[in-house]
Amino acid sequence: MVSYKDLGLVNTREMFAKAIKGGYAIPAFNFNNMEQLQAIIKAAAAEKSPVILQVSKGARNYANATLLRYMAQGAVEYAKELGWEKPQIVLHLDHGDSFELCKNCIDFGFSSVMIDGSALPFEKNIELTKKVVEYAHQFDVTVEGELGVLAGVEDEVAHEHHTYTDPEEVIEFAQKTGCDSLAISIGTSHGAYKFTPAQCTRDENGKLVPPPLAFNVLDAVMEKLPGFPIVLHGSSSVPQDEVDTINMFGGKLPDAIGIPEEQLRKAAKSAVCKINIDSDSRLAMTAAVRRVFAEKPAEFDPRKYLGPARDNMEKLYRHKIVNVLGSAGKAE
């Protein structure tokens, strides 16, 4: 058993309370490798923003649980080297699909876990989430539950259709499970194709314009659970400059589209205190790598293409922290 506190990590309880009160959201950035982690920590340290390092089941299998634990511990020390005296860093399991996986992550030093029982019948979701909460809270690990289903594909999570969260269920779910935060579905999606062209309109230049999020559902949830931490998954904006770069240098991402940043800014000022971003960093990384290979086809030193990828991701993360989520300066 490894305690996250011995690794220098924190859970989400205090940072979420501050975020709700302050009208901003904590960035939750997924990572799979060293370059992504370096970019996240450099951005968070530079902007003094609390940050959640997210690891999916697929990323955990890819990177190895033991290595991830030491990477997270190293991230805390790296942040201090960068001048962030008291880093507020969470190591979080994204979309845990079983009690066993959540337990194993807690035992390995994760400070927060998500148990995703959203595809289960309501009572079964409550039962599974409660079981994880009871184990996690013994070690002061925070737990995120989920109600409602997001469409899209990301790692090992795949659903064809949205199921919006039913506001009438949230009180019972929160009370019976004891979860610390709740992921809801209001129209966001996983992956780089969050909406089909048929779901969108087009502007005067022919660019796709995505439909608005269901803020009425969010408002109803907040009315039922005032002051309770809400989470949005699938919240990448799919920057069109990165998509254009990828396509310019041989990629094929036609009609890739995400959540407009103005809608995320609006959400961040509400009880939404955690916003998940994964696809955007993948796009930033891929765009930078493709550019290097196109401009320097003889290059084969990984540092020469992963370095620019890391820098491009850091730029993206800092933009999200400062201009979208409003979390800069909240972890001085």
PLM segments and residue spans:
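Generic N-terminal amphipathic, Lys/Arg-enriched alpha-helix
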Residues: M1-P27, E299-F300
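A short N-terminal beta->alpha junction/helix N-cap motif
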Residues: S3, Y24-N32, A59-R60, K304, ...
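Alpha/beta enzyme core
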Residues: V10-K21, M34-A59, T66-K86, H95-P229, ...
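Short catalytic-loop micro-motif centered on adjacent basic/acidic residues
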Residues: I26-N30, L91-H92, M114, I230-L232, ...
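Shared catalytic-loop signature of beta/alpha-barrel
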Residues: R60-N64, L264, C273-R291, E295-P297, ...
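Short acidic/histidine-rich active-site segments
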Residues: G234-S237, I257, I277-S281
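Extended, intrinsically disordered, low-complexity segments
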Residues: A288-E332
